A protein has these predicted regions:
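N-terminal export signals
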Residues: 14-19, 25-46, 126
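Short, cationic motifs built from Arg/Lys/His that form the positively charged side of catalytic pockets
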Residues: 23-24, 82
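Divalent metal-dependent phosphoesterase catalytic cores across multiple superfamilies
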Residues: 53-305
Length: 305
């Protein structure tokens, strides 16, 4: 089956978007990280290529799912995902346990239909569910997978194992040996580190900040406060909103290569929680960087949704 990418953005339909209050109630301050922008000719080409870096290869059919990141508590599931092509109609999350089945319609997370999230409530604590993603016609978008809710506060598990890590972001770099690299570690090496952590079968993972490295200003020397080379080459309209137009395209272009190929679908059965740090607000923190400029604050907030 062939697919032609639509020329127009999806029109804003308020019921397609998850209300901010629900996100805050669910995550209670923790959130996922995504950000970035750089729209000159060279970054467009290089970052577009990185966008398609092969995610973690495994014996599971990801279909058209580019990346999938779940979070849970004892009665709720929140799944954020992106697809290799835009979906013009809302996909659905199918949740099964024993003889019980329910369908949860996706909330649109961008304006083009590539990014969606699914929010399910009133689930049972400490219960494994079988999940699957479907298009609006019921066709499978990927293979099924298991995901468990957390125990209730009244339960007393004998043990828990949590994976903690930090500073996993950054565009693709080169590694030649110990102490010899250019830029960030290659995605393949970061994937191996995460897979090693997942091999210990943690019940959850916490990514402690710096998911995106794309500082827009420099804060050293005579040029303190001026746009960095990345900032000069970016195409941001700092007076405009983040979502829609070139600002959204720029954010996706820089964020995609730092998130989607790194995680792929490897964490589909491991709830992961993203905390934000300085670089997730588009700066390397300094006394001069506060308060965070309005536009960069909107970037940070947008990447949490």
């Amino acid at each position: 089956m062939t697919y032609k990418k639509p020329d127009k953005k999806i029109k804003n339909k308020s019921n397609w978007y998850l209300p901010p209050l629900k996100r805050r109630d669910f995550l209670r301050g923790s959130a996922g990280g995504m950000a970035g922008a750089w729209l000159s000719t060279w970054p467009w080409q290089k970052l577009s290529a990185q966008q398609n870096l092969n995610p973690v290869t495994e014996d599971w059919d990801s279909g058209i799912v580019r990346h999938l990141l779940p979070a849970v508590n004892e009665t709720q599931i929140l799944i954020k995902t992106s697809f290799t092509r835009a979906l013009r109609e809302a996909p659905r999350l199918r949740i099964q346990n024993g003889g019980s089945t329910r369908l949860v319609e996706g909330y649109l997370n961008d304006t083009s239909g590539e990014f969606w999230q699914f929010y399910a409530i009133d689930l049972q604590p400490d219960t494994e569910y079988e999940l699957s993603l479907q298009d609006s016609r019921g066709n499978a978008l990927c293979e099924r997978w298991p995901l468990s809710t957390f125990p209730s506060p009244q339960q007393n598990p004998e043990k828990v194992r949590v994976l903690f890590y930090t500073c996993a972001g950054g565009p693709e770099g080169e590694y030649f040996g110990i102490g010899d690299r250019r830029g960030n570690l290659p995605i393949a090496i970061r994937q191996r580190l995460l897979r090693r952590g997942l091999s210990f079968t943690p019940q959850a993972a916490v990514a402690n900040g710096d998911h995106i490295y794309w500082d827009l200003h420099t804060w050293q020397g005579d040029r303190a406060g001026e746009l960095s080379p990345a900032g000069q080459l970016s195409n941001f309209d700092f007076a405009a909103r983040v979502m829609g137009g070139s600002n959204e395209d720029a954010m996706k272009l820089a964020a995609g290569p730092q998130i989607a190929p790194l995680y792929g679908t490897a964490f589909r059965s491991t709830p992961v929680y993203f905390l934000q740090d300085d670089h997730d607000h588009w700066e390397n923190d300094s006394p001069l960087t506060y308060p965070v400029p309005w536009f960069q604050l909107q970037l940070a907030r947008t990447t949490q949704q």
